[in-house]
Amino acid sequence: MKKLSLLAAVGWLLLAQPAIADDGPQYDPRGTKGCMKCHDVDAQKPIMAIQHTVHAVIADKDSPFAKDNRGCESCHGPSAGHGANLQDDEVRPAPAINFNTSLGLSPVKDREEACLNCHQKQGHVAQWQGSAHEQADVSCTSCHELHTQNDPMLDKKLQAEKCYSCHTNERIDSNRASHHPMKEGLVTCSDCHQVHGSNGPSLLTGFTVNETCYSCHAEKRGPFLWEHEPVTENCLNCHLAHGSNNMRLLKVRSPYLCQSCHMQKGGHDSALNLPGDSKFDQKGCVNCHSSVHGSNHPSGIKRHR
């Protein structure tokens, strides 16, 4: 009898507790179906094209669409109000986290967090915090397009155009006479730059400029018996990375490039040190000093061979 009285008393206390009102943002119980009521896959409403991307693979446990039936709200946050039935005079609120400029962008940190909730464990974004792009308030969706089957950032032939939307000087350089084969689709920005953060300068994939260049130009790495100090120090002492009006991406055409260092103590007469109409004028120094990057020949101290 005492036990029953005790249980009754506990039950009464529980019932007497005031209900805690939950007025915070709510998830739409309909999940993605609630979104498809308005958003469909066609030219006018392409939002649900995300269904054809890796983000909507339900069989993948890490996919946003596989989590608690939340679908779109896995990224956009609890947005039941956005999908609610409204009266004609009511204004539809934006999703909790909005990536669309037409409805007003959410703060960069909120948009970043929506992506990093899943991607922070992946190595390529480990250095995002504090990177040049992060400090410039570039968000993931400033570059990536999620509601399309073909994200241009993941397409080697399209990626550069997306980067050029901010890096306009590099677009100009890439159209110069001498350039890396960007327009030809053979290389792209991320072959040299780690856009999510890097230990190297200028978001390079290597720790130094030279290490980055050597990933393709391995024959220039050395070590050489007779090294050329400016080359060993930095490829950019002689070359422009994104494009040049001079052959081989040179900053200045030969022989003038060489003379920027070798002018004062040249071992040649003035006809060679100050080329004019001589037969050496077109290629100048490299007519003889062909191994400008270094030489392993026993007699290659002058980089003649």
Model-derived features with residue positions:
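Bacterial N-terminal signal peptides
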Residues: 5-16
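Short sequence/structural segments immediately N-terminal
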Residues: 19-305
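N-terminal secretory signal peptides that target proteins for export/translocation
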Residues: 1-2
